[in-house]
């Protein structure tokens, strides 16, 4: 299975940590966020890494070059940050099979393998790692509605009145069918091409998307305090493992 990592963002909210580097190169527990992402994807069996870069992309390219732990890396350039569906289309020519998608500003310690296993065994059209959050936080995320079979029936991007508190976490598996859906996406009220709309198009066309509930934790590294929390969690787990 191939893997895509989205790492084009400026990380404005992470300043001053991103004044001289892209968000993915901010260190957490002694190594860049992207290294955490790459390690997990390689451990999950990624045979190819496709990294979407943008802001200060040369720093990422110089650091990782063309391979990581023996897995080849290809870079795709997103010249303008116009949403996740827009970013995903930059890799269309590099992906020809089912693939993992990870947002390159998240730290995971969770059951990512369950998502990959579901994709491989059930031949679902997609599978997402999802988690429940406090209701007053749900409007910050892509919110999922599921049926009794654990299939996602609707995704709404940052709704003012969330119909659910189940949200996407930033780890997905897809078939290449997602690219056609991304081509059909129209700009949202925010002026972005939202991946949630592409997902909704897949659902309305009869595709099956499975929701895998998180077992563990993940943190979106949006602010300096998020970086600090992720670092503390990782260090605590390292300490516990050595006791």
From Swiss-Prot:
A GO biological process held by the record: S-layer organization
Gene Ontology molecular-function annotations: UTP:glucose-1-phosphate uridylyltransferase activity
Gene knockout outcome: Mutants exhibit defective or limited motility.
EC primary class: transferase
Keyword list, A-Z: Nucleotidyltransferase, Transferase
Reactions it catalyzes: alpha-D-glucose 1-phosphate + UTP + H(+) = UDP-alpha-D-glucose + diphosphate
The keyword Nucleotidyltransferase appears for this protein: yes
Primary role: Involved in the assembly of a N-linked pentasaccharide that decorates the S-layer glycoprotein and flagellins. Involved in the biosynthesis of the hexuronic acid found at position 3 of the pentasaccharide.
Xref: NCBIfam families: UDPGP_AglF_Halo
Stated family: Belongs to the UDPGP type 2 family.
Entry protein name: UTP--glucose-1-phosphate uridylyltransferase AglF
Organism encoding this protein: Haloferax volcanii (strain ATCC 29605 / DSM 3757 / JCM 8879 / NBRC 14742 / NCIMB 2012 / VKM B-1768 / DS2)
């Amino acid at each position: 299975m191939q893997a895509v990592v989205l790492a084009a963002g400026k990380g404005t909210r992470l300043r001053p940590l991103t004044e001289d580097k892209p968000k993915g190169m901010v260190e957490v527990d002694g190594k860049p966020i992207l290294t955490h992402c790459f390690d997990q994807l390689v451990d999950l069996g990624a045979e190819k890494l496709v990294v979407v870069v943008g802001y200060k992309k040369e720093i990422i390219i110089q650091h990782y070059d063309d391979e990581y732990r023996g897995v080849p890396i290809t870079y795709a350039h997103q010249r303008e940050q116009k949403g996740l569906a827009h970013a995903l289309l930059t890799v269309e020519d590099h992906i020809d099979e089912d693939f993992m998608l990870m947002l390159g500003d998240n730290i995971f310690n969770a059951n990512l393998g369950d998502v990959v296993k579901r994709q491989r065994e059930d031949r679902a059209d997609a599978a997402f790692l999802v988690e429940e959050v406090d209701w007053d936080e749900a409007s910050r995320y892509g919110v999922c509605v599921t049926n009794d079979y654990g299939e996602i029936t609707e995704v709404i991007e940052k709704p003012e009145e969330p119909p659910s508190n189940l949200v996407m976490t930033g780890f997905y598996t897809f078939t290449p069918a997602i690219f056609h859906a991304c081509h059909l996406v129209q700009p949202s009220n925010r002026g972005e091409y939202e991946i949630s709309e592409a997902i909704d198009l897949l659902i309305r066309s009869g595709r099956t998307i499975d929701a895998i509930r998180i077992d563990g934790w993940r943190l979106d590294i949006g602010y300096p305090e998020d970086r600090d929390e992720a670092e503390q969690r990782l260090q605590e787990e390292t300490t516990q493992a050595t006791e």
